[in-house]
Amino acid sequence: FKYAFDTKTGAYVRTGMLDEKGKDTGIDPFQGSFPHLIDVGVMGHCIHGKTGLCAKAGIECYQNGMYQEATNMSVEDFREIVKQCEGKTNQLALGGRGDPDQHEKFAELLEISRAHNLVPNFTTSGYGMTENIAKLCKKYCGAVAVSWYRSRYTLNAIKKLLNAGVKTNIHYVLGKNSIDEAIERLRNDDFPSGINAVIFLLHKPVGQGTVSNMLSPEDPKLSLFFEQVEKRHKFLIG
C-alpha cells in the first residue's frame, strides 16, 4: 500500500492493498513493513516523580518513577535510532521514565528528529515547563500532551504551550480514584480553554500502580462516563 503524511498538520492518508498493477483493492493492510509511529524512551529517571507530586495527585506511576534511577538516552544513541527510522516512519513519541522536556539535550533531540523528517511528540507533567521550552515545542513538535496532575504547574504548562501556539492535549489517567472527577469535568466542560483534546488513559497496575485502583468493566460509573464522552464538547476526546 501507499500512504502520505503531512508533517505540518499530522494528516495521514493511505490506500488499501495494491494489486500487481498498482490498483487499490480496497482491502485494508494488516500491517506495514515498519511502524508509522515509534515510542523512544529517552528518559531514564523522573525529576517530577521523585518529588512525590505524582502520588500526591493520585497518579500511581507505572514507570515507578519515584524510585527508579537510570541515565537518560545519549544523543548518539538517539541519532542512531532516528537514522534507522528515516524514510520509514512518520512520528517519534518521546518518552521513558520522566518528562522528555527535562532531558539535558532536549533541544538537540528535537532538532535531530526534524532534520530526518520525523515529527517529535511527547507527554509531560509540566513540572519544568518554561516559555523557552514551549517555543521549542512550537518550532519542532507536532503536538504536546500534559498529564492531568490537578496542580498549578499543570495549568501553567498548558497556558505556556497554548500561548506559544502548540497543539496541546491533556492526558487523564482513569481509575477508581479519578472517574468521578472525569465525569464531572466532562459534564461541565471543565478543562482549560483552547486545548485540542482530552485523552483518557486507563490506570495500569504495574510499577507503583495498584490493582485496587483498576476500574472494573461492570462499574456503573463507566456508563455515566461514556454518556458524557458521547456528548459534544469544546475539545476532542480520545
Placement of each model-derived feature along the sequence:
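Flexible, acidic/Gly-rich N-terminal and inter-domain linker regions that tether
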Residues: 1-39, 56
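A C-terminal junction/extension of Radical SAM enzymes
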Residues: 1-3, 194-238
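Canonical Radical SAM [4Fe-4S] cluster-binding loop centered on the CxxxCxxC motif
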Residues: 28-76
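A structural signal for well-ordered alpha-helical scaffolds and beta->alpha junctions
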Residues: 35, 39, 106, 154, ...
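Short catalytic/ligand-binding loop motif for oxyanion handling, primarily in non-cytosolic enzymes
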Residues: 48-50, 68, 101-103, 178-180, ...
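Short aromatic-enriched loop/helix-cap "lid" or pocket-rim segments at secondary-structure transitions
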Residues: 51-56, 106, 134, 182-184, ...
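Residue-level preference for long, well-ordered alpha-helices that form the structural scaffold
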Residues: 70, 74, 102, 178, ...
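Radical SAM/AdoMet-radical enzyme domain recognition
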Residues: 75-203
